[in-house]
């Protein structure tokens, strides 16, 4: 008969300072299918180390160990996990049940890593618990069960995937005599059903119930009777749960990891909330700064556009503040006509201006009088609350008409409901009011200077008596590059004048400068907010490292029942990501509240959340969870199952 478990010259040593301490010294042992074997020995004899090697939790330093003819030394970590999952079931002295899971959920754990569907897992767990007399305790937590009941749950867990080989480490060590008898009776039943039962104990009475007692002393076998040739197997073996395909196993493991992550968060609500707080503040800061910053930028740009966009202003002289007399008459009406003929010009509006006194009845105020064309108001985004702008007939005829701004209207006509048709004095020239222009409210504030507008022909011919222009505003056609238009305009006037006695001011250049400046400021503020997100991520990493330390034994249990290192990595990584995702969702909610509050105090701001901003926030949460959860998850996955099980 071929042995099920075959050990040849197994040695196991551990480093102790500069030396190696040999715990197992050339163990040679054969165990056959269906046997009930007891391994006995005093504390420190090496029996627990031997059990760990038998259960593929540990590897021998030298020697050969075969399971069903397969040399375990040739297997990688995942293959060893599969071997434990499909062939071995562990029963521990201290039960090693997961305290936050019910009895039924504890029994299900091995099948989770085998990729068994939830419905099948549930039925199998209920069947095993019913067989072991715990059908009325399926929803109980370990703390609600007696020691004997916990050990029976442990046995059911060992049988979940079939449990061809049952490894029982001091299964009765923490039980009273009655519970001890119950557990031993169950082990005998398992042996009768065809399971190979290996009991590690120091109790002679427990060992005496085995068919074969192997004694180990100081790492060497001192008694090893031959195996019984015929093993009585009354019933069939347990149905073996085969490992599912890679995809099914991944999906099952992912769902279980997600469920376990949620339970872990719910078990420590205050700590979880405090951990999330950093993520909440970080995400809320990033989203709020992006959204509110964008609203502020749009407000600034809207104010600039209200002044007039896609326009180029032409002034006489070398630059602002140049009052050299030789340049004052640089711009002529012929220049205006030449500019209007260019194919890239939508309109060209001249301007002449002078500070004058305005009088109506007994009201006398100072104002800025501006001679413009009818297109001026459209170029600068102005609307009319009363009346309208000049028409071409009024421009050609130098009509004595005037448009007031709203401030001038209030000064001259504080009690009149309609001022169109009223006559005022502009300087010494009577002029009929034909409209009241409303300038767009700007976040930069309004000018305190009273302003009126007359036809440029009237202003230059009747009021000022000059033949030159103070400035020309050129509106560029849509789709034409403003910078190129500015170059062509400069070239045109330079050729006409024979020199460059003027300068230009491009509003689009100002707009681009403002856009660049606001974008830079927004980026800087976002980077500051990202720092708070990083701090929150470090908090997540810290708590996850603490969690790994606190749950070391749980990790060992999961590895013992068949979890791979990748399963453990996935478990803790999902927990970190879940913390960050929930924190991210709360952070977005907080940023919405901040935005709505600001909207109440700043009604002119258009604060909106684009789907892209929300998507980026969730991506930030996920990436934060992955980045800062990777190290703790990797540490958990690298734990040695034997060391993990030994920790309290």
Swiss-Prot record:
EC number: 7.6.2.-
One Pfam family recorded for the sequence: MacB_PCD
Ranges where the ABC transporter domain occurs: 5-243
GO annotation, cellular component aspect: plasma membrane
InterPro entries associated with the record: AAA+_ATPase, ABC3_permease_C, ABC_transporter-like_ATP-bd, ABC_transporter-like_CS, MacB-like_ATP-bd, MacB_PCD, Macrolide_Exporter_MacB, P-loop_NTPase
Membrane topology according to the record: Multi-pass membrane protein
Segments traversing the membrane: 273-293, 523-543, 576-596, 611-631
Intrachain S-S bonds: none
Similarity-based family: Belongs to the ABC transporter superfamily. Macrolide exporter (TC 3.A.1.122) family.
Subunit annotation: Homodimer. Part of the tripartite efflux system MacAB-TolC, which is composed of an inner membrane transporter, MacB, a periplasmic membrane fusion protein, MacA, and an outer membrane component, TolC. The complex forms a large protein conduit and can translocate molecules across both the inner and outer membranes. Interacts with MacA.
Main function: Part of the tripartite efflux system MacAB-TolC. MacB is a non-canonical ABC transporter that contains transmembrane domains (TMD), which form a pore in the inner membrane, and an ATP-binding domain (NBD), which is responsible for energy generation. Confers resistance against macrolides.
Name used for this protein in its record: Macrolide export ATP-binding/permease protein MacB
Annotated organism of origin: Escherichia coli O157:H7
Gene: macB
């Amino acid at each position: 008969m071929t042995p099920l478990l075959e050990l040849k010259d197994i040695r196991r040593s551990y480093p102790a300072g500069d030396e190696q301490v040999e715990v197992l010294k050339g163990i040679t042992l054969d165990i056959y299918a269906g046997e009930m074997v007891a391994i006995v020995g005093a504390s420190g004899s090496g029996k627990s180390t031997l059990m760990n090697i038998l259960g593929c939790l540990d590897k021998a330093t030298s020697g050969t160990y075969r399971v069903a003819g397969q040399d375990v030394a040739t297997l990688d970590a995942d293959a060893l996990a599969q071997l434990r999952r499909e062939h071995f079931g562990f029963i521990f002295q201290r039960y090693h049940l997961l305290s936050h899971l019910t009895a039924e959920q504890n029994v299900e754990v091995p099948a989770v890593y085998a990729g068994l569907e939830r419905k099948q897992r549930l039925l199998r767990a209920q069947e095993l618990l019913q067989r072991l007399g715990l059908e009325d305790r399926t929803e109980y937590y370990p703390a609600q069960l007696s020691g004997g009941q916990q050990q029976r749950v442990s046995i059911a867990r060992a049988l979940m995937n079939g449990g061809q080989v049952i490894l029982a480490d001091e299964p009765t060590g923490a039980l009273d005599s009655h519970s001890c008898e119950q557990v031993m009776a169950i082990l005998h039943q398992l042996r009768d059903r065809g399971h190979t039962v290996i009991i590690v104990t120091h109790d002679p009475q427990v060992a005496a119930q085995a068919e074969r007692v192997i004694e180990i002393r100081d790492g060497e076998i001192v008694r090893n009777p031959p195996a019984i040739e015929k093993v009585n197997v009354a019933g069939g073996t347990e149905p073996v749960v085969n490992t599912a395909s890679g995809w099914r196993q991944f999906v099952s493991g992912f769902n279980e990891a997600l469920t376990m992550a949620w339970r872990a968060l719910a078990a420590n609500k205050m700590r979880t909330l405090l951990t999330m707080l950093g993520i909440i503040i970080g995400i809320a800061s990033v989203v709020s700064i992006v959204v509110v910053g964008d609203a502020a930028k749009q407000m600034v740009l809207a104010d600039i556009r209200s002044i007039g966009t896609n326009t180029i202003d032409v002034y006489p002289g070398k630059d602002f503040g140049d009052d050299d007399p030789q340049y004052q008459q640089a711009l002529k009406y012929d220049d205006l006509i030449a500019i209007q003929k260019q194919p890239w010009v939508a309109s060209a509006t001249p301007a002449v201006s002078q500070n004058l006194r305005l009088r109506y009845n007994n009201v006398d105020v100072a104002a800025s009088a501006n001679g413009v064309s009818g297109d001026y108001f459209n170029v600068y985004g102005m609307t009319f609350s009363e009346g309208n702008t000049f028409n071409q007939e009024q421009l050609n005829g130098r009509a004595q008409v005037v448009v007031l701004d709203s401030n001038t209207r209030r000064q001259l006509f504080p009690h009149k409901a309609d001022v169109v048709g009223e006559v005022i004095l502009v300087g010494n020239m009577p002029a009929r009011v034909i409209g009241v222009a409303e300038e767009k409210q700007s976040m930069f504030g309004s000018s305190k200077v009273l302003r009126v507008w007359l036809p440029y022909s009237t202003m230059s011919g009747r009021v000022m008596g000059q033949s030159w222009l103070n400035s020309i505003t050129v509106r560029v056609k849509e789709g034409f590059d403003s910078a190129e238009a500015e170059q062509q305009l400069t070239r045109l006037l330079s050729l006409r004048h024979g020199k460059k006695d003027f300068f230009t001011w491009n509003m689009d250049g100002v707009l681009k400068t403002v856009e660049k400046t606001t974008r830079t400021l927004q980026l800087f503020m976002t980077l500051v907010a990202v720092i708070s997100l990083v701090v929150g991520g470090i908090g997540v990493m810290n708590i996850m490292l603490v969690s790994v330390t606190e749950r070391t034994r749980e990790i060992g249990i999961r590895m013992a029942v068949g979890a791979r290192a990748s399963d453990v990595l996935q478990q803790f990584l999902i927990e970190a990501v879940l913390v960050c995702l929930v924190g991210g969702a709360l952070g977005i909610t907080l940023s919405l509240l901040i935005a709505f509050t600001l909207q109440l105090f700043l009604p002119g701001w258009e604060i909106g959340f684009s789907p892209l901003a929300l998507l980026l926030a969730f991506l930030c949460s996920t990436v934060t969870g992955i980045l800062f959860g990777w190290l703790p998850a990797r540490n958990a996955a690298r734990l040695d199952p034997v060391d993990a099980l030994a920790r309290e």
